UniProtKB/Swiss-Prot annotation:
Position of the signal peptide: none
Protein's name in the database: Large ribosomal subunit protein uL2
Gene from which the chain derives: rplB
Alphabetical UniProt keywords: Ribonucleoprotein, Ribosomal protein, RNA-binding, rRNA-binding
A GO molecular function held by the record: transferase activity
Source organism of the structure: Ralstonia nicotianae (strain ATCC BAA-1114 / GMI1000) (Ralstonia solanacearum)
Keyword Ribosomal protein: yes
Keyword Iron-sulfur among UniProt keywords: no
Any Pfam family the entry gives: Ribosomal_L2_C
Family membership: Belongs to the universal ribosomal protein uL2 family.
GO terms, biological process: cytoplasmic translation
Free-text function comment from the UniProt entry: One of the primary rRNA binding proteins. Required for association of the 30S and 50S subunits to form the 70S ribosome, for tRNA binding and peptide bond formation. It has been suggested to have peptidyltransferase activity; this is somewhat controversial. Makes several contacts with the 16S rRNA in the 70S ribosome.
InterPro entries noted in UniProt: NA-bd_OB-fold (IPR012340), Rib_uL2_dom2 (IPR014722), Ribosomal_uL2 (IPR002171), Ribosomal_uL2_bac/org-type (IPR005880), Ribosomal_uL2_C (IPR022669), Ribosomal_uL2_CS (IPR022671), Ribosomal_uL2_dom3 (IPR014726), Ribosomal_uL2_RNA-bd_dom (IPR022666)
Amino acid sequence: MALVKTKPTSPGRRSMVKVVNPDLHKGAPHAPLLEKQFQKSGRNNNGHITTRHKGGGHKHHYRIVDFKRNDKDGIPAKIERLEYDPNRSANIALVLFADGERRYIIAPKGAVVGQAVANGPEAPIKAGNNLPIRNIPVGTTIHCVEILPGKGAQIARSAGTSAVLLAREGIYAQVRLRSGEVRRVHIECRATIGEVGNEEHSLRQIGKAGATRWRGIRPTVRGVAMNPVDHPHGGGEGKTAAGRDPVSPWGTPTKGYRTRSNKRTTSMIVQRRHKR
């Protein structure tokens, strides 16, 4: 994996930096693990925009990734190939099990073709292996961590991310996330050893607006450039300041204002990611 700066043959390519991985599979993905993905462009079933700045982009299939990894315990497997996934920042690995089944998993850092991977409580503590947290030594770097047992991985799934198992107390373990938050999870939740691969993803430079449009992301218009009917910052003769503290289009403060309302799981957060 390497960062490659393109030749400045145009203004768009002048500042472009790509992440190149020659080990990625260059052919088609594994067809039985593909699903159609219909474009919603940020709209709900009423046609109303629920997520702004979405639309367009290249068509692609969804790759069915196994985030649970709980029904192949004890069955040997090996990485058959590494693949690009347009649906996420991390790469994925096609794993072939001894019983002949193939599945996609998130490719861990350092994964190579032919590497053995294992699932279950007896799996060795090695990158790419998936175990219950009760069987993982304290201090181990982990990724693809479950929040609820059996629900599938929800924490530390994007490129270059990881978490650290800090402690185990009774039926709960404490995990420190990349954001600095320390969270309690049940010891029966599963996690994968190591970090997520493609760690240079954050160093890429997209280079031009069109490449962002290929990804299905539309432009973000500033509130002060809108009319008063469209945004609290809008209006005014000529170029004017917002005239108030920054807010969202719906009037919610947008600089550091906390909007978390899920009191049911607040007790599971040992240390917040905020410093104050």
